[in-house]
């Protein structure tokens, strides 16, 4: 798959699709480092902003992690915790506070799930590691 600048699909989406395909095929295995922003830009002859946007998209999908000074790497497959909502409970997805992001070690763009129990108790769980089940 090549990046087609004449396509109606934005360049950053094309690059994200290409990288996602390589991750899903195992070409970029969990834990492996992705090429740098500069390398991807040069290899695909696209602007660095398009690379940044593609990386941000994949990060928001939970496929990759980035760290200043360490680069970008493929995340290990996440184990999801199954939470059964009890009658009278409610759940919403929202963006975490800075403190919640730090405490849960969440990547930017990953939401949290806030569950309110029938007695008003509140639980906040990482959205990329939680699956809600209705009874």
Please describe what each predicted stretch is.
Residues 69-75:
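Short, structured interface segments
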Residues 38, 47-48, 63-66:
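Hydrophobic alpha-helical segments that drive targeting, anchoring, or assembly
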Residues 50, 57:
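Residues in the helix-turn-helix
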Residues 1-46:
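Extreme N-terminal segment that seeds HTH/winged-HTH DNA-binding domains in transcriptional regulators
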Residues 24, 42, 59-60, 102:
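Short polybasic/polar patches that bind polyanions
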Residues 75-135:
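All-alpha effector-binding/dimerization core of bacterial HTH-type transcriptional repressors
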Residues 28, 32, 61-69:
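Beta-hairpin "wing" of winged helix-turn-helix
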């Amino acid at each position: 798959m090549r990046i087609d600048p004449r396509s109606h699909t934005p360049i950053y989406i094309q690059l994200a699709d290409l990288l996602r395909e390589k991750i899903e095929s195992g070409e970029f295995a969990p834990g492996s480092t992705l090429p740098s922003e500069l390398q991807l830009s040069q290899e695909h002859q696209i602007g660095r902003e398009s690379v940044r946007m593609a990386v941000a998209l994949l990060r928001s999908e939970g496929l990759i992690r980035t760290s200043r000074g360490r680069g970008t790497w493929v995340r290990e497959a996440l184990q999801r915790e199954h939470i059964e909502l009890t009658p009278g409970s409610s759940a919403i997805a929202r963006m975490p506070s800075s403190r919640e992001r730090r405490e849960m070690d969440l990547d930017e763009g990953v939401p949290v799930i806030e569950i309110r129990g029938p007695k008003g108790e509140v639980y906040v769980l990482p959205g990329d590691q939680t699956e809600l089940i209705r009874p």
